[in-house]
A protein has these predicted regions:
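Phosphate-group recognition and catalysis centered on beta-loop-alpha active-site segments
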Residues: 1-209
Length: 209
């Protein structure tokens, strides 16, 4: 759907199953698949037997990157630090074989230690810390791993935060925007991107501003 709507990018969440980064948001299987229990209990065989829709298991990151083939940006949110090495492997494969440029593949995480790990394995690759509060030092948390952007919560993003991030050379990308009033407010604040569930809805509002 995102490709059909010509979205600028796709956001997805990955967790580690065996030697694959699997695209799944929740820690548990029951909400988004026909499985039960924790994702961490899966092995390769049990993952392949899951039904996440149309009889298919949740895709791996490598499978999705091969399908997207550089047509848009992909934001990879790390849901567990243990997946870092596998995500680095998949990023290298996507750049080498699937038509992506490095700047199209940003890695984000609430666990900033995971971004430090990734920065050590893949120096200079785009990373963005996720934050859910407006910190006293604003966007300073992005500096230890040379981030290119910071991903902030819609309810806590204000002008002081945006100005501080921009002064540090960071893009500000805000998640997850579902209300027109918030979209307009963020546009006026000068944020660089927003995460939305409905691309056509957001474009319709922004085109009128």
């Amino acid at each position: 759907m995102a490709l059909a709507e010509q979205a600028d990018g796709i956001e997805l969440d990955v967790r580690l199953v065996a030697d694959q980064a699997i695209i799944i948001h929740d820690e548990d299987l029951d909400r988004t698949t026909n499985g039960l229990g924790a994702v961490t209990n899966l092995d390769q065989a049990s993952w392949q037997q899951l039904d996440a829709g149309d009889g298919n298991p949740p895709p791996s990151l490598d499978q999705l990157l091969a399908m997207v083939a550089g047509q848009c940006r992909v934001n990879i949110e790390l849901k567990c630090r243990e997946a870092v090495a596998v995500v680095v492997r998949d990023i290298k494969q996507a750049i080498a074989a699937y038509g992506f440029r490095a700047e199209q593949l940003c890695v984000s995480a609430f666990d900033h230690h995971a971004l430090v790990d990734l920065h050590k394995l893949l120096p200079g690759h785009p990373v963005a810390p996720l934050i859910s509060a407006c910190h006293l030092d604003y966007a300073a948390c992005a500096e230890p791993f040379a981030a290119q952007a910071i991903h902030s919560h819609v309810e806590t993003t204000n002008q002081a935060f945006v100005d501080d991030a921009h002064a540090r050379g960071l893009d500000v990308r805000v998640y997850t925007v579902t209300r027109e009033a918030d979209l307009i407010r963020l546009y006026k604040l000068g944020v660089d991107a927003v995460f939305v569930n409905d691309v056509a809805w957001a474009r319709g509002i922004l085109s009128a501003l």
